[in-house]
C-alpha cells in the first residue's frame, strides 16, 4: 500500500465538502422589470435551442450564453433544465389561453367546445415536434423539485378544458372531467411524438374520449 493510501486510511474522516446553495427566485418574487425581462430572455433562449435540437440540446451554459446572462444567474431563476423546460411549457399554455377568444370558441355544446380546444392545443403542439418533445419530456420526468412548475402546467390545461366545456363558471365535475381529458391528451401527445400514432389517430382517440366522458349533447 502506498504512503498516500496509508495516510488517507489513517486520517480522521474529513468533513463533507460544502455545497453552495443557490437561492432560486420564484416567479412571484420577480419584483423588477429587469428581472422579469431576464426571465423572459432565458425562456426565449431555452425554446430557441430546443426548437433546433430538442431536449438534449438544452444545456444550462448554452442557455445562459444565448440569453446573455451568467450561468450563476441562470441557476437563480431555474435550478435545472427540467425546471426551464416545464416553465417554458407553462408559458406556452398561458399564451395559447390568452390568445383564445372565449366568445369565438366554436360549438354550441360542451362536446363541441371541448373538441375545439383540444384541437387547438394539438395543432399548437404539433407545429414544432423538437420543441414539444423537449418540453413534454421534461414535464413527464420532472421530480418533486419541480412540483410547483408541473402543478402550474396541470392547472392551466385543466382550466382551459373546463372553461371550454362550461357555459359560465366551470363546475367541480367539469374540472374533474378536464383532468381526465388532460391525461388522455398528454398520453396521445406522447404517442404522436414517439411516432406510435399519427395526428389523425390522435384526433380520433381524443374525439372518442371526449364523447365517452361528456357525450355529444344537443344542449349547452
Curated annotation (Swiss-Prot):
Gene3D superfamilies: Tetracycline Repressor, domain 2 (1.10.357.10)
HTH tetR-type domain ranges (all copies): 36-96
GO annotation terms (biological process): regulation of DNA-templated transcription
GO molecular function list: DNA binding; DNA-binding transcription factor activity; protein homodimerization activity; transcription cis-regulatory region binding
DNA-binding region residue numbers: 59-78
Record Pfam families: TetR_C_20 (PF17925), TetR_N (PF00440)
Transmembrane segments: none
Described function: Controls the expression of genes used for utilizing diverse lipids as energy sources.
Database matches in NCBIfam families: transcr_KstR (NF033703)
Protein's recorded name: HTH-type transcriptional repressor KstR
Organism in which the protein naturally occurs: Mycobacterium tuberculosis (strain ATCC 25618 / H37Rv)
Amino acid at each position: 500500500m502506498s504512503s498516500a493510501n496509508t495516510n488517507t486510511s489513517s486520517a480522521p474522516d474529513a468533513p463533507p465538502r460544502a455545497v453552495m446553495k443557490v437561492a432560486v427566485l420564484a416567479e412571484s418574487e420577480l419584483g423588477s422589470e429587469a428581472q422579469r425581462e431576464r426571465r423572459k430572455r432565458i425562456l426565449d433562449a431555452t425554446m430557441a435551442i430546443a426548437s433546433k435540437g430538442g431536449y438534449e440540446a438544452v444545456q444550462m451554459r448554452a442557455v445562459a450564453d444565448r440569453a446573455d446572462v451568467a450561468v450563476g444567474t441562470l441557476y437563480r431563476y431555474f435550478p435545472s433544465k427540467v425546471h426551464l423546460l416545464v416553465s417554458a411549457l407553462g408559458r406556452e399554455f398561458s399564451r395559447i389561453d390568452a390568445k383564445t377568444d372565449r366568445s369565438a370558441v366554436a360549438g354550441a355544446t360542451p362536446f363541441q367546445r371541448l373538441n375545439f380546444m383540444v384541437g387547438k392545443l394539438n395543432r399548437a403542439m404539433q407545429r414544432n415536434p423538437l420543441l414539444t418533445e423537449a418540453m413534454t419530456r421534461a414535464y413527464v420526468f420532472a421530480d418533486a423539485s419541480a412540483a410547483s412548475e408541473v402543478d402550474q402546467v396541470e392547472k392551466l390545461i385543466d382550466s382551459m378544458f373546463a372553461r371550454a366545456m362550461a357555459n359560465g363558471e366551470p363546475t367541480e365535475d367539469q374540472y374533474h372531467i378536464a383532468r381526465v381529458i388532460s391525461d388522455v391528451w398528454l398520453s396521445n401527445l406522447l404517442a404522436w411524438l414517439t411516432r406510435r400514432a399519427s395526428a389523425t389517430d390522435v384526433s380520433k382517440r381524443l374525439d372518442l374520449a371526449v364523447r365517452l366522458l361528456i357525450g355529444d349533447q344537443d344542449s349547452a
